[in-house]
Amino acid sequence: LCVNAELEGKIAIADFVAPFENARNKFFADYEIFVDTIEEGRFEDTNKVFQRPVATDYNVQEQRGDVDAKIIAYEIGQRFIWNNQAPTTQMLGRFQPWHPGHQALFDRAMAKHEQVVLMVRDMPTDDSNPYPAHEVIENLQQSLCELAGKVKIEVVPNILNITYGRGVGYKIEQEVFDDATHDISATKIREQMRKEGKL
């Protein structure tokens, strides 16, 4: 199965109950995900001999399968496809939260080059920045999971100035949108989320 998937440029995912470390090692997995969400399984004989994984790539500890699946798929897909030397568009922002205005800007960024790097400013949490950086990244990964490999998301310092010399080989551009898109307000979105108890 794995050989055929690799020949077709695809990724094979296998789900096993494998209580022994040496048995798991025989799969020669590129990435190992440990779903660690229960104290014991329903099979007593498996519980008795179970050996916890020593080292895994991902350790899922909460019952939020859809969320974790999207995040893990995004991260693994990115490793296979992202090309650091390919022409890339950069977007810098707080994304508190990611909204249709950001999406419209992102769509234009993708149209300029084949991949986009999203830089999340690491802000102190307050009313205007309710999400810590790691939660912003999770939200972005869920929103953009279908573009894994074409989008890279990074936390950067709280950047307030960007300086450059002449002849640098890249452009800094402001995108202009229609009034409906331009008027999308993250402040109003946060206020509505608070009213609905989502924030």
Positions of the model-derived regions?
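Conserved beta-strand segments of the P-loop GTPase G domain that flank and frequently precede/overlap
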Residues: 15, 34-36, 60-62, 119-120
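Short, well-ordered beta-strand core segments
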Residues: 32-34, 57-60, 89, 116
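NTP-dependent small-molecule kinase module
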Residues: 31, 47-84
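ATP-dependent NMP and nucleoside kinases share a basic, alpha-helical "lid"
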Residues: 6-7, 14-55, 165
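Conserved alpha-helical scaffold flanking the Walker A/P-loop in AAA+ ATPase domains
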Residues: 1-5
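Nucleotidyltransferase catalytic core that binds NTPs
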Residues: 79-199
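Phosphate-bearing ligand-interacting subdomains
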Residues: 12-18, 147, 154
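Short, charged, surface-exposed secondary-structure boundary motifs
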Residues: 40-50, 68-72, 182-188
